[in-house]
Amino acid sequence: MFTSLKINRIICIYVVLLVLFGVFNSFKSKYYFTSEVADKIVFEGHDKTSNLSYFEIEEILEAEEQISIFIETNQSYIYPSLMYEQEVETNEDVIEYREALKEIGREHYFLSNIHAASSIELNIFGDAHISQYSPYISAKVDTEILMKNNYELLKSIASKASIAKVFVKADEKENQNFISTAIDGIEFTNYQNTTGYTGSGIRIGMLEYGIIDEDNANFDGKTAVARTVWYFPETVTPHATSVASIMISDEGIAPDASLYSVEWFNSPDGEIEWLLDQNVDIINISAGTSSANYDSDSAYFDYITIAYSVLIVAAAGNEGDLGGEMSNVAMGKNVLAVGASDSEQTGVMMLSSYLTNNGDHKPNVCAPGDGFDMMNIGETGFGTSFSAPIISGLAAVAMEIYPYLKIQPMRMIAIMQAACFYDIDFTKNEWGFYEYAGAGLISFANLLEILNYYDNYHTQIPASSTRGSMYENLFTFTAGKVCKISVIWSAMVSSASSSPSSVQTNVCYLNVVNETTGAVVFSIGTSSTAYLSNKYIAEFVVPTTGDYRIVFGRLETNSHADYLGVAARQYTLADDGTEAD
């Protein structure tokens, strides 16, 4: 028999259980999505953890009035560059080629993206952009709307069949922090005076958190254009003006190149498409999030590089002495990541980022990152922000010499890597790169030598159901000299993701074989971690003078084609073990 006390206790327990059940349901509604929806929503963070938890994202959201979202639509990725072949010899040929690629991309993506946008009530977003050339929609949304009814908006978007992924951008972006001091370090001035190369006919795009001051005296008589439209309130910044000056001012690397400047607002697709519509050959990015994570931005830049045959050069970041985290842009496997050396080219600056969380190696190369006196700007600068435009300027000079390099980004990266030197006896990793310096410190003299005296190649390797050799070519090397061979092959994006597993990187090997004896004198890429990288450096002392066959092959079958870039050079070792002049 129940006493009144027992009944009261039962009632109290029941009430407590009801309260707890309500709290649980509230928590579940707020922080638990169905598995189908949860798999399609990614909160991208800014620390070493690739994604933030719902608790962490809420703290960040509550501190922001608006937040960026990057929506991947549910359609197949295509690579226009693999679908359209054209001989390119002149700058006019390049423009015709790029227009054809954009038309292919537009026909495949634009209407499907519009259909997807119509299903998600795009009118509630600010700064919305529907991509013409890739499977993305980007927008900004008021934080209050995003969090309303326990993230009902996110759940609604992710539940649509036309949507593949929704990325909530909670990252912190920052710019990665006269000119002749640094240029002397790469042996540029003397070669510029004797060769006369100025980057003429080359178009450089620049993506920054700000735009250039078009009226700055450094751009007098130059083609220096900033996107200025009423619906994008872009801000002129000294950082953007400084980066551009390194490339195209009279004292810059490529003074006759044209430059197009755009401010990075939300997700990068709208800004990059504006640059593509200017027919740029190179995109310099001295900005990003230093997280060491491969994220949706990394995947996007990887895709654009190969799909539209444009070289993307990115600052590695300035976190070297704070944790080492690489910029998310520079994490792209098809992106040319640039670290910072000192202005004397004797070593890598301590601030230069080098750490990645996916096992790949970055940076690709290093260039001077200090010794910059910013004429007509009124400040000094240092860091990888100023290293990247040196490489972009050198690429413009190379493209002026050989216009076909404009549409061969893998070849251009291979050449840059082969043109590097490093006189400090640090250990290389299994792919032939130094931990902090990548392939080494850039030399313009070496770059010209490769372009004019050594063979370098760009080829498309078809999809194959077999393993083994996919590319072979003969090079002639001299006994006693050091041979440096650089190879890089394209990574193909199959979906945007915060995981590098979204990028298909074929597992490949590189052998160097003596053509006369058949002996393998150097081999790389046979280890269990070969799948982590899409680039190798082979560096060895040549045993005998003669022909050597470079053999590049796959260790596994694959269903997609690759672009391969190969470059090589030889040099003599000085008595102290450094590279002789």
Residue ranges and their predicted role:
Residues 31-42, 114-194, 536:
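Autoinhibitory propeptides
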Residues 208, 325-400:
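Extracellular S/T/G-rich loop segment that most often corresponds to the catalytic His/Ser-adjacent loop
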Residues 275-297, 314-316, 488:
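Short acidic, glycine-rich surface-loop motifs adjacent to enzyme active sites
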Residues 284, 400-479, 524-538, 579-581:
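C-terminal subdomain of the subtilisin-like protease fold in secreted/lumenal serine endopeptidases
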Residues 411-414, 473, 501-503, 514-516, ...:
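C-terminal edge strands of extracellular/lumenal beta-sandwich accessory domains
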Residues 496-509:
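Short coil-to-beta strand junction motifs in C2/discoidin
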